[in-house]
Curated annotation (Swiss-Prot):
It holds the Pfam family GTP_EFTU_D2. The lineage of its organism: Bacteria, Pseudomonadati, Pseudomonadota, Gammaproteobacteria, Aeromonadales. The gene is lepA. This is Elongation factor 4. It comes from Aeromonas hydrophila subsp. hydrophila (strain ATCC 7966 / DSM 30187 / BCRC 13018 / CCUG 14551 / JCM 1027 / KCTC 2358 / NCIMB 9240 / NCTC 8049). GO terms for cellular component: plasma membrane. Gene3D superfamilies: 3.30.70.240, Elongation factor 4, C-terminal domain, Elongation Factor G (Translational Gtpase), domain 3, P-loop containing nucleotide triphosphate hydrolases, Translation factors.
Amino acid sequence: MKHIRNFSIIAHIDHGKSTLSDRLIQTCGGLSDREMQAQVLDSMDLERERGITIKAQSVTLNYQAQDGNTYQLNFIDTPGHVDFSYEVSRSLAACEGALLVVDAGQGVEAQTLANCYTAMEMDLEVVPVLNKIDLPAAEPERVAEEIEDIVGIDAVDAVRCSAKTGLGVDLVLEEIVARIPAPEGDPDAPLQALIIDSWFDSYLGVVSLVRIKNGSLKKNDKIKVMSTGQVWGVDRIGIFTPKQVDTMGLGCGEVGWVVCGIKDIHGAPVGDTLTQAKNGAEKALAGFKKVKPQVYAGLFPISSDDYESFRDALDKLSLNDASLFFEPESSTALGFGFRCGFLGMLHMEIIQERLEREYDLDLITTAPTVVYEIELTDGTTIHIDSPAQMPVITSIKEMREPIAECHILLPQEYMGNVITLCIEKRGVQTNMVYHGKQVALTYEIPMAEVVLDFFDRLKSTSRGYASLDYGFKRFETSDMVRLDIMINGERVDALAIITHKENAQYRGRQVVEKMRELIPRQMFDIAIQAAIGNQIIARSTVKALRKDVTAKCYGGDVSRKKKLLNKQKEGKKRMKSLGRVDVPQEAFLAILHVGKD
């Protein structure tokens, strides 16, 4: 056991985590040169296309250290994006240490800080690594000072390496062996294994990634899942070298995968503990704190026949992604679907794209909303996550919206633009600290504003230099209203949005204009209105197409033309009272982008 090292790699987006993992695998000979490819751990097509890590991946390597011993390194490559921070905290729970990778050109950024604090809270040993020192813009001395100044860990003798060229990677490995503690645990105690991650394989059933905290696990053991009490036999067990390799068992302190032939998707939830069926452990390990979704949106299959396969797809995805929440919902405009909860807009995009790709579904999304707290006049408090659940205005005593605490790190020269942006988003500044050339701003901004497009706007006003980390702080009383969109006098429930009263007029006008461009012209006029309660605040009309009925009259009396025109008018009136307007798919998507430009 004293030759095992478990660690994660944490860093901000694009600071070179995945490339460093590649080098570690290559140096330790985990894969032959032929099988090696860039970002070998980003196994999803989506990850490779966007160049980001979404799922944490684990690898077991054997490293021949300079002191002559062979060490077993179990490491987990983690995502850097704020939407996937729960992946990071789960990975850290399985480790004793973390490599904090910092780009020697960019310096410390918000996610670096957030992930590093998470690691310190869990009492992990944090080892700083300065990456990308082969770049002409690299300033390792300045960045080392920055790490000490902002993060507060000793970084003067931090390892300098370049993951791309492979320079200094052996030093990183030596640092890991020297500084990260060996796992603690009792090999002879009853088994306690923490499930870090699970995914569904159509041949094997549920595959779980586990970290053995106490005891050991062998093939053909009978094990019990502690939360459900079900007993299973271990069919296959092994490690990733990044390839799945079968072994006979896992010892204390090791990380590996287990297949027990569990077919029920909820059979082995993430954060659960496995133990032996006979004389097992008394109590379960402390799991992970449940993450609450921040953004909710309705997802509906375009053809209603896909509803069942959509439910299956969500089930399988939620096994792999513990933070996805969903419940059935129905809409008069869109039929049956699910109300899903996500951690942020990127998470929502990724999930939607994974559903469409991996499960071949065509989906419509409704406008995303955050969770609001409403105090009713009878004194009860309710939480709503969709405009449809909002009670009538007369029964609402006060409405509270979620406020997010945002930590923004940016170079001084962009401070003006960023502050303007925060004020526009109804933000309140609570703190500001200078660290060398960097400024750390703390703002309290309504979650609804942060979640929609704050991240994109922040990146564009600061030319990509500002970085953001945010978390839910509290609910605060606010003047929110529900904006309904009416087409020909009928409310379309899927187009309703909850917005702040100050922005309601503007949002309403914009949505109405947008809809006018997107709804195809019919044989009759279509009125598109935006309303708050019974008060109409914006309106626009899609003009009717008309046939030239008087074309066949040549000369002749004006009353003949009048008769034909009146007859046409009557017909249009009748069509208008009976005609239904189909709202095209693009119109629902347009709602998402209102207020961006």
